[in-house]
Amino acid sequence: MEVLMAERANLVFHNKVIDGTAMKRLINRLIEHFGMAYTSHILDQVKALGFHQATTTSISLGIDDLLTIPSKRWLVQDAEQQSLVLEKHHHYGNVHAVEKLRQSVEIWYATSEYLRQEMNPNFRMTDPFNPVHIMSFSGARGNASQVHQLIGMRGLMSDPQGQMIDLPIQSNLREGLSLTEYIISCYGARKGVVDTAVRTSDAGYLTRRLVEVVQHIVVRRTDCGTIRGISLSPRNGMMPERVFIQTLMGRVLADDIYIGTRCLATRNQDIGIGLVNRFITFRAQPISIRTPFTCRSASWICRFCYGRSPTHGDLVELGEAVGIIAGQSIGEPGTQLTLRTFHTGGVFTGGTAEHVRAPSNGKIKFNEDLVHPTRTRHGHPAFLCSIDLYVTIESEDILHNVNIPPKSFLLVQNDQYVESEQVIAEICVGTSTLNFKEKVRKHIFSDSDGEMHWSTDVYHAPEFTYGNVHLLPKTSHLWILLGGPCRSSRVSLSFHKDQDQMNAHSPSIKRRYTSNLSETNDPERQKLFSSYFYGKKKKKNRISDYSNLNQILCTGHCNFISPTTLHQNSDLFSKRRKNKFLIPLQSIQEPENKLMPRSSISIEIPQNGTFRGNSILAYFDDPRYRRKGSGIPQYGTIEMHSIVKKEDLVEYRGVKAFRPKYQMKVDRLFFIPEEVHILPRSSSIMVRNNSLIGVDTQLTLNIRSRVGGFVRVERKKKRIELKIFSGDIHFPGETNKISRHSDVLIPPGKPNSKESKKWKNGIYVQRITPRKKKFFVLVRPVITYEITDGININLATLFPPDLLQERDNVQLRVVNYILYENGNPIRGFSHTDSQLVRTCLVLNWDQDKKKSASSEEARASFVEIRTNGLIRHFLRIDLVKSPISYIGKRNDPSGSGLPSDNGSGWTNMNPFSSIYSKARIQQSLNQNQGTIHTLLNRNTGFQSLRILSSSNCSRMGPFNDVIKYHKESIPITLITKDPFIPIKNFKNSLGPFGTAFPIANFDSFSHLITQNRILVNNYLELDNFKQTFQVIQYYLMDENPKIYNPDLGSNILLNPFNWNWYFYHHTYCQETSPIISLGQFICENVCIAKNAPHLKSGQVILVQVASVVIRSAKPYLATPGTTVHGHYGEILYEGDTLITFLYEKSRSSDITQGLPKVEEVFEVRSIDSISMNLEKRFKGWNKRITRILGMPWGFLIGAELTIVQSRISLVNKIQRVYRSQGVQIHNRHIEIIVRQITSKVLVSEDGMSNVFSPGELIGLLRAERMGRALEEAVYYRAILLGITRASLNTQSFISEASFQETARVLAKAALRGRIDWLKGLKENVVLGGMIPLGTGFKGLVPPSKQDNNSSLETKKKNLFEGEMRDIFFHHRKLFDSCRSKNFHDTSEQSLLGFHDS
């Protein structure tokens, strides 16, 4: 006893969990050391101990044992945040649908996988004896994936078609599912319940086919004598140690293993765990092992090539049916895994790429010539490295070098600052042999009706040249311009022309906007701008139907008129400012008193940019002359008429100018207020005509009166006018002189009226005679406005001082004029103000009498000046010479070929290309006479446009004059082709004035055929991006600024604005500076100005100086190779197919969906798509190698190499599927199956052999031997058969007939006269004969036969001593030895082959 205690004291105590793998290893070691009998005794004790412990522990599973992982909440939130950002990018058109789906799947897969990995550590720390933890992680019941569904999250699922549902199930089964999640889960449940039976039968059928193909493979001899093997190396690190050990265990060495001069192991020695550990420890040379692939026996296998038996750990015995064992070993896990089904929705990509992270903070540098820009598979901008790239990260005192391997994506820009552990590159995992891929088509459908536009060239696919299917050559946007198409079956006769106004109530428009004019508000008016119906209707001379006025849609170049002020019986279209740009100037500082209306100064410029003498330059709306509501203006009295010569406002060629005319001199303006409601004809009115009402009386269902007084109701054809007059009523009986007056205005302070002292502001007397009643007089209050003369007004108080600086020969005068005619009623609605008096700034200049012709007009243009990084805007007014001088200069051959002003010509430069210093600006100012004023006036805090009147400044743009005066007959010389332009000098000749943008009448541009490349060369400024944006944001602007009109009857209209408008807020916009041009497409998240709202995506259809009108459009991003359905400008309806993506998708290796994947490998169906180039390369290589080595050796080597490579690849693929499910299958079993799949070659038609006919399948060994025997080449190529086809191409027709197609196989065999030698197991079972296998096989062989065999073995060895390893260089020796070889081995095979054929 003491001895026993002492021995126990010396034993090592292991306190570790023994799982299934550890238990397997322990039993192997026990068998090696103690043998079978002793090991079984030990295992009985272990079993008894296990049952005893399980009974005493009595583990049971309750719902309280399911503890959710604490980190789940923030992990899911993080994934949701990423998904939200992704959705935004998709909406903006930065990523397309496939990239979104792919990224969404990976986000949720990574989250789910991380949660799964968290389970074990979480349980180990918080509750190590949790029953769920003990059961699942010991392998006793369930696996990690099932527990993950209980306490982690269910994750992504697949729909019945096997497609991913990108909405993940975030809950786990412990928390319970929401209704949506439950419905998504139902797909998986159906798979689990219904498919289990189907899948079990699938797994059973797979097992049957596997057994069928290898049932005749039996261990027949000890050693086949092969010298070939497969080499494995523990050094290269490509193979994990676990896989390396598993591959080596139980194998037999094909060669001696040396470390230096010491022999570690010898040939034909079987490998145990001790030898494997020594190999790993000593890092031995590549180890060559024997496998079933290298066995020389055709129909069976030898002991050494098979290795150890999996049952007892010794070399396999003779007569063992290893083929059937292999088939069942592979088929059985499929059955087992089907029964414990688990669904991840087909996401077993494991394809989260490896990342390279920055070692420290610092600035990154790399050689930009070695990379080129691309998109990652998630749609992010990146750089692709074609070769190894060395990246340097400079921190304060240290340089880090990082090597980026080839074909990786670099996710940062050069000179970008990166933080420690930031992902800087993504290493592309070689997925060619890893994953199963399939090509999937994804159709994208239109979300709305609209018109299709492309922003880049699209090629016709060759097979659809006359159809509407197109292929995209490069990444670009596809735009659907929203609009309501007319779906009427009848084609209506249309008189509409482009850009016409249209009534929105017209029947060809699908939707309507109805609103009551008396309650018009700003949101209603905003609807018109956001409305995407730009219809067309013939212009009316008069609009009498006021209720439709709010539906006038703004298109083309008409400024929008808001119907706040209606002039009775006036033509609305003539009042519209068709030919003006309005530039409102607003103060930076908000007014302190919010209630005071802000006074607005607007600069008014004609659209053709030309001022004539006495033109209005700016106007000022004085808030004192602003009035809310309706009323009647009066500025003449019955007693006082003084006629004075005064200037009147007239229209002349679209330009407002003052001309002398006789008109009443007005010093006071009277306004008689009244409340007016214009109602639809169908309105129900709750007050009577000619009645008196009080304040806040109900007039209609939703209108109340604002004032009290006398009601007058007038019913007209299409509307009702309801007027309320406030005031006092006087009947004629009263002793009042007022009653004598009728419809007269009595001004205040009239000396001969005693009663007028009561009325401080004067009164308006109106006589009213109701039907059959006495008349009475209504005395209405009057508001008086004093109008000061324009000469006495101080300009500085009204206009910004910057407009009134010292100027060269430019005069400015102030003129007041009244906006309304005398006695004309004003109809104001919805609390909007009516401006009664406007103060104008009239522009004039000194005209030299000698050169009067040359200064009739002044030309306005915008100038942009950039100084010290600040961009400033100016308005420049140049005096223009007469057109005759231009034509003369243009046609003068001695001239420069270009119209010029003071010889400087017109020039252009990119405003971003140069930044001027103060010194240079001063220097330029000395050269160019004229004044430039700074943008900010520090005293007043105003910001405004400046007027530069330097007549000798260089002027922009030939379009104003060349086209204007040569429109009819003279052909236009296009800028792009003009040889006289000194392009190199463009940047230097303009000085500090930057680019001047001419304001021209763009109607005349319609006949230009090509674009002016010089003027449209500034697209996007990227200087500030590097400083302000750490996040890379690429916006795809439109590449094609042309406008195509889809109407076939009209001409194609090119970009009418051949320049680009820059929009800046008054403070310099650092974020971005896009250029807005007409017809351009804008993505939604592009910022136009700082603090400005982000625009919705769309196409610019109207550019004004301070605003842009955008037609809503939806962008769809498409990558190269995408198919586009439909033509440019085609009208599409909701639900139509827009584009089709073709992309590769990693298919699931999950066994429930993945069992078919294993089957596909065994059946050798096409899994990965092979490129055409690769196939051509292989064919070329085959031709070359046969030419170099000669016919017999070319075919032999080509077929051998192909077969060896495909065998290894197939084994790896099958193992990967099973390992992903945690199933361990020894490589030997798979190798036996794959050997049978790849054992045949196909006789080719290149050469007619005497023995085989073309297209015949023969064994590779047989083809080699027959070629040697006949001394002529047999032309053949390698072929992969698949298990079903291999089962139907064996040496036994009885075996084939019992598998499939019985009648066909038997009929064919009878016609050919085939003989079945009954070598295999199945044939003998069918015929009821003795089975030719079993481990008692060696006892049946007589000793004499055994002796003969041994003598033959020695003879064979002597004959093969001359056989060399390398068939490339020693083929003569090999050929001679093969010819002199004993025929014993081949006779039987040849005989069988001849009978087969």
Curated annotation (Swiss-Prot):
Alphabetically sorted, this entry's keywords are: Chloroplast, DNA-directed RNA polymerase, Metal-binding, Nucleotidyltransferase, Plastid, Transcription, Transferase, Zinc
| Catalytic activity line of the entry | RNA(n) + a ribonucleoside 5'-triphosphate = RNA(n+1) + diphosphate
Question: Coiled-coil stretches, from where to where?
Answer: none
Cell compartment(s), UniProt: Plastid, Chloroplast
Q: Does the keyword Transferase apply?
A: yes
Q: List every stretch annotated Disordered.
A: 502-521
Q: Name one GO molecular function term.
A: DNA-directed RNA polymerase activity
E.C. number: 2.7.7.6
Name the positions where Zn(2+) binds. Answer: 224, 295, 302, 305
Pfam entry (one): RNA_pol_Rpb1_4
Q: How far does the signal peptide extend, from start to end residue? A: none
What is an annotated GO biological process for this record, any one?
A: DNA-templated transcription
Per the record, its GO cellular-component terms are: chloroplast; DNA-directed RNA polymerase complex; mitochondrion
Among NCBIfam families, the record links this protein to: rpoC2_cyan (TIGR02388)
Q: How does it assemble?
A: In plastids the minimal PEP RNA polymerase catalytic core is composed of four subunits: alpha, beta, beta', and beta''. When a (nuclear-encoded) sigma factor is associated with the core the holoenzyme is formed, which can initiate transcription.
- Give the function comment from the record: DNA-dependent RNA polymerase catalyzes the transcription of DNA into RNA using the four ribonucleoside triphosphates as substrates.
Q: To which protein family does this belong?
A: Belongs to the RNA polymerase beta' chain family. RpoC2 subfamily.
Q: What is this protein called?
A: DNA-directed RNA polymerase subunit beta''
Q: Which gene encodes it?
A: rpoC2
